[in-house]
């Protein structure tokens, strides 16, 4: 028997149950190539600032960014240790699959 699990689908389902995302400012730390970022965008936050230390991953995320989310999502190379945002800039912070 083979059971396939989509961890990102389960993750987004759990995140939807936790709180309202509409019109919230979101920081995603460890966004990788942006797969979860794009799913978060469907929850209608005001903005998503997605960071990852991998420059290649950020390039991929920017390349794959659909035009419908271009004004909503901002990708940046960076790490959790060196966040360059003022305090209280975000309503929600997401750390997913970050070690």
Task: Report residues per predicted region.
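Non-catalytic interaction surface on structured domains
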Residues: 1-6, 35
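Conserved alpha-helix/loop element of class I SAM-dependent methyltransferases that forms part
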Residues: 5-24
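Short, flexible helix/strand-to-coil boundary loops that buttress conserved ligand/catalytic motifs
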Residues: 19, 62, 87-89
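Active-site acidic short loop of glycosyltransferases
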Residues: 23, 70, 87-88
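Class I SAM-dependent methyltransferase SAM/SAH-binding core
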Residues: 27, 35-82
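Conserved glycine-rich SAM-binding loop
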Residues: 32
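A short acidic, Gly/Pro-enriched loop at the edge of an enzyme's catalytic core
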Residues: 81-92
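A short SAM/SAH-binding and catalytic strip from SAM-dependent methyltransferases
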Residues: 91-99
């Amino acid at each position: 028997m083979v059971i396939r699990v989509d961890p990102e689908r389960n993750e987004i389902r759990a995140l939807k149950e936790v709180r309202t995302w509409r019109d919230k400012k979101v920081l995603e730390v460890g966004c990788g190539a942006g797969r979860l970022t794009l799913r978060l965008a469907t929850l209608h936050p005001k903005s998503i600032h997605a960071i990852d230390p991998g420059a290649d991953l950020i390039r991929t995320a920017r390349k794959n960014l659909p035009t419908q989310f271009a004004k909503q999502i901002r990708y940046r190379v960076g790490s959790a240790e060196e966040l360059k945002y003022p305090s209280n800039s975000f309503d929600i912070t997401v750390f997913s699959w970050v070690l």
